[in-house]
Amino acid sequence: MFCVQCEQTIRTPAGNGCSYAQGMCGKTAETSDLQDLLIAALQGLSAWAVKAREYGIINHDVDNFAPRAFFSTLTNVNFDSPRIVGYAREAIALREALKAQCLSVDANAHCDNPMADLQLVSDDLGELQRQAAEFTPNKDKAAIGENILGLRLLCLYGLKGAAAYMEHAHVLGQYDNDIYAQYHKIMAWLGTWPADMNALLECAMEIGQMNFKVMSILDAGETTKYGHPTPTQVNVKATEGKCILISGHDLKDLYNLLEQTEGTGVNVYTHGEMLPAHGYPELRKFKHLVGNYGSGWQNQQVEFARFPGPIVMTSNCIIDPTVGSYDDRIWTRSIVGWPGVSHLEGDDFGPVIAQAQQMAGFPYSEIPHLITVGFGRQTLLGAADTLIDLVSREKLRHIFLVGGCDGARGERNYFTDFATSVPDDCLILTLACGKYRFNKLEFGDIEGLPRLVDAGQCNDAYSAIILAVTLAEKLGCGVNDLPLSLVLSWFEQKAIVILLTLLSLGVKNIVTGPTAPGFFTPDLLAILNEKFGLRSVTTVEEDMKQLLSA
């Protein structure tokens, strides 16, 4: 096992990465190794997808499957080894079908990629794990060095984050052939184990640029189906009655659940990154969507154990449900998996609803505590002139985007302390689950404009980018000249691709934490600092002083 993709990876003087029987996320060495094997199979599939496009062949089954299966290897998504192997087998079957399509056009069709003809050696998980050793990401570290390995992983993990957003967009009916062609090209190239530093740096920026387009179609999918988010108050306390909790990012799953629970007497609560759903008109119209429950994903083992109903996980993040003994009432959807828990294959939530009706639910309603979400792209753009006016009248000094992933590391208190230290004449724009560090606190307003503005899920960084570009255009300056600073927390691969997106767009002087990714070497950090001004957090006092004086 070698995995260094998330923030909580093991870090030692000898090197970084989880390489024992189990990773810090709870992933076993078996599952981790089989995920490496799956990625190799997906690289071979993408290699043939690139070749097929040369013949004008676009196989939508391949395009739909490839990013979804890659998503299953993201942190805290799928811990179920047999399902990972199932994805690998499906990848190979689709590859062979695509290869046959190419051969039907050109009998001499050939794909010159090391992964293009990969076959699984056995049905036995142990044998497959041994085969997977050929594809462990650091297998040639001694030959290529830490810097090249780090850049490879930056590209692989960044592309994995983009694949997750591609799947979210696909679920909502969004497809862009150019994006999929670019995805397959990059995925196939990474399967050649590239070792050119400049080419890898260029690839990282290409992934960021591609992801901006992915976030655009995802935004279009969400707003077309569910309307543009508008500011909405959400209760974060319990309401009497039977209940279901839904976590993750998939708004379509939430909509289906709300439709199927309507009139059943079962209330629905959002958790984690599902919180922004309350801002969408077509979702909040359901009166039994009663509130948001819990805090950051890392606290779920305590909070889920206390929730008096079933729980549905639609995407990341799931962690071991046996710890809180709620594994008999947690359900996984789509690419999510945990050994031994119930998995919903389709869109029928009937079994979950039936379980909710058999459980006690909340015995009484607590005194409401309301927070505000729903500052989507249209709302943010509608406030652009107000922001400019406040800046011109020196009522608004600075905007801080404080957001990103949450996690368990104690140093993440930095983001709470930073938010509460922001001066009263400054605004905090937030997104993703890092907001749970401070989103239940009171920040007041500036002439009626809330000082804490929740823009949505991690992918809604797109809205923040569009706002920044709009403000820069209106003020006749560059984005980097705005009174705007980005203070971002990271945990997994979606955060990595958001960072690459920002860097590829030329955004500079981003501050990140609580630690640097484990695959970043000192040399890579120095390169990113020199090119983009990217740096790690220090202390709240020093960072605040520097950002306000920039």
Curated annotation (Swiss-Prot):
Gene Ontology terms, cellular component aspect? cytoplasm
Q: How is the cofactor bound?
A: Binds 1 [2Fe-2S] cluster.
Q: What is its main location?
A: cytoplasm
Compartments, record wording: Cytoplasm
Q: Which residues does this entry mark as bearing Cysteine persulfide?
A: C405
Q: Where does hybrid [4Fe-2O-2S] cluster bind?
A: H249, E273, C317, C405, C433, C458, E492, K494
Which catalysed reactions does the entry list for this protein?
A: A + NH4(+) + H2O = hydroxylamine + AH2 + H(+)
What is the superkingdom listed in this entry's lineage? Answer: Bacteria
Looking up SUPFAM superfamilies in the UniProt record yields: Prismane protein-like
- Which InterPro entries does the record associate with it? HCP/CODH, Hydroxylam_reduct, Prismane-like_a/b-sand, Prismane-like_sf, Prismane_a-bundle
Essential cofactor(s): [2Fe-2S] cluster; hybrid [4Fe-2O-2S] cluster
| Positions with a binding annotation for [2Fe-2S] cluster | C3, C6, C18, C25
GO MF terms here are: 2 iron, 2 sulfur cluster binding; hydroxylamine reductase activity; metal ion binding; peroxidase activity
Keyword set, alphabetical order: 2Fe-2S, Cytoplasm, Iron, Iron-sulfur, Metal-binding, Oxidoreductase
Any idea of its EC number?
A: 1.7.99.1
GO BP annotations listed: response to hydrogen peroxide
Q: What does this protein do?
A: Catalyzes the reduction of hydroxylamine to form NH(3) and H(2)O.
Q: Which family does it belong to?
A: Belongs to the HCP family.
Record's PANTHER family?
A: HYDROXYLAMINE REDUCTASE
Write the protein's name.
Hydroxylamine reductase
Protein source organism: Salmonella paratyphi B (strain ATCC BAA-1250 / SPB7)
Source species taxonomy: Bacteria, Pseudomonadati, Pseudomonadota, Gammaproteobacteria, Enterobacterales
